[in-house]
Amino acid sequence: MSRRSTAEKKTAKSDPIYHNRLVNMVVNRILKNGKKSLAYRILYRAIKNIQQKTEKNPLSVLRQAIRRVTPNVTVKARRVGGSTYRVPVEIRSTQGKVLAIRWLLGASRKRPGRNMDFKLSHELMDAARGNGNAIRKKEETHRMAXANXAFAHFR
């Protein structure tokens, strides 16, 4: 048995311009090869793009998009007696938020377009409206969980 205590959860720091933790979480997921300044540049340009297109507060659009994409349940593979079942599991809000950010960025990377800030801004606006590939991913996950509700007792 390990004698180490469980590590404390680290809270996300806020970003330098908007002083928002959610913005920093998105920047840390955009990050590739340690180029944080590039990740900040991509997100800030996307935010500026959203502001010009929608004429709304871009942070509220970001919050709305993440809220719409955040899943309530997910499926986990569970081996029981030689066969694998996809068991539906409820997820906490923090984990749901992380999944939502990951899905939004994955959908915007796959999107056709000029550059990442253009693709990200359009994916965020679509998700805030209730359509887009990230929303489709959430609905697909929920459908999978509803289809496998019979295996919920394997949790």
Curated annotation (Swiss-Prot):
Listed GO biological process terms: translation
Matching Gene3D superfamilies: Ribosomal protein S7 domain (1.10.455.10)
Main localization, broad class: plastid
Keywords recorded for this protein, A-Z: Chloroplast, Plastid, Ribonucleoprotein, Ribosomal protein, RNA-binding, rRNA-binding
UniProt entry tagged with the keyword Cell inner membrane: no
A Gene Ontology cellular-component term: chloroplast
Coiled-coil segments: none
Record's subcellular location: Plastid, Chloroplast
Single GO MF annotation: structural constituent of ribosome
UniProt subunit comment: Part of the 30S ribosomal subunit.
General function of this protein: One of the primary rRNA binding proteins, it binds directly to 16S rRNA where it nucleates assembly of the head domain of the 30S subunit.
Family to which the UniProt record says this protein belongs: Belongs to the universal ribosomal protein uS7 family.
Record protein name field: Small ribosomal subunit protein uS7c
Species in which this protein is naturally found: Cedrus deodara (Deodar cedar)
Lineage, uppermost ranks: Eukaryota, Viridiplantae, Streptophyta, Embryophyta, Tracheophyta
Designated gene of the protein: rps7
